[in-house]
């Protein structure tokens, strides 16, 4: 078994390609030559493809150059003569007006939204103020103020809080309320009697 393993290892060692013999100068520059060979092989196999970000950067640079050249041309044309300045400024104003029409309508829309939001915020602020005032009155034991019909939609009267000892006179919180809610008597049905009956007692149906 050991002999078989030894023969396999010897065959593998003999089958490996041997590097060619080089001069001493080549041995000193060996790492550089390997790197160069690797770069050449990589270049031949996988040509470098410019990335999408590089394309974007080039396009942005070209646009900036074109914009800069247009700015220089406009400065040169404006300094050439006053008549051209008046013509260019009129054309620019006309172009700006055309461009500003949608933006002005958009700004008007935004201002309307801002006014609407301000009204909402003011209404919310008024509601909070009213609630805090109501809470103060209930805590101090003062009578409640009347509520407008508009405000009644938003507010509910707070229930009496019996657990606050300071808000009520001594020992009134201890006793249960004297007023008990009774059912209404308007829901009692009408008494019924037989049509042919003489002097019979009428019994209500509950």
UniProtKB/Swiss-Prot annotation:
<keyword id="KW-0494">Milk protein</keyword>
<dbReference type="GO" id="GO:1903496">
    <property type="term" value="P:response to 11-deoxycorticosterone"/>
</dbReference>
<comment type="function">
    <text>Important role in the capacity of milk to transport calcium phosphate.</text>
</comment>
<feature type="modified residue" description="Phosphoserine">
    <location>
        <position position="79"/>
    </location>
</feature>
<protein>
    <recommendedName>
        <fullName>Alpha-S1-casein</fullName>
    </recommendedName>
</protein>
<feature type="modified residue" description="Phosphoserine">
    <location>
        <position position="80"/>
    </location>
</feature>
<dbReference type="GO" id="GO:0032570">
    <property type="term" value="P:response to progesterone"/>
</dbReference>
<feature type="modified residue" description="Phosphoserine">
    <location>
        <position position="81"/>
    </location>
</feature>
<feature type="modified residue" description="Phosphoserine">
    <location>
        <position position="78"/>
    </location>
</feature>
<feature type="compositionally biased region" description="Basic and acidic residues">
    <location>
        <begin position="91"/>
        <end position="100"/>
    </location>
</feature>
<dbReference type="InterPro" id="IPR026999">
    <property type="entry name" value="Alpha-s1_casein"/>
</dbReference>
<keyword id="KW-0732">Signal</keyword>
<comment type="similarity">
    <text>Belongs to the alpha-casein family.</text>
</comment>
<dbReference type="GO" id="GO:0005615">
    <property type="term" value="C:extracellular space"/>
</dbReference>
<keyword id="KW-0964">Secreted</keyword>
<feature type="modified residue" description="Phosphoserine">
    <location>
        <position position="77"/>
    </location>
</feature>
<keyword id="KW-0597">Phosphoprotein</keyword>
<feature type="signal peptide">
    <location>
        <begin position="1"/>
        <end position="15"/>
    </location>
</feature>
<feature type="region of interest" description="Disordered">
    <location>
        <begin position="67"/>
        <end position="106"/>
    </location>
</feature>
<feature type="modified residue" description="Phosphoserine">
    <location>
        <position position="89"/>
    </location>
</feature>
<dbReference type="GO" id="GO:0032355">
    <property type="term" value="P:response to estradiol"/>
</dbReference>
<feature type="modified residue" description="Phosphoserine">
    <location>
        <position position="82"/>
    </location>
</feature>
<dbReference type="Pfam" id="PF00363">
    <property type="entry name" value="Casein"/>
</dbReference>
<dbReference type="GO" id="GO:1903494">
    <property type="term" value="P:response to dehydroepiandrosterone"/>
</dbReference>
<feature type="modified residue" description="Phosphoserine">
    <location>
        <position position="33"/>
    </location>
</feature>
<dbReference type="InterPro" id="IPR001588">
    <property type="entry name" value="Casein"/>
</dbReference>
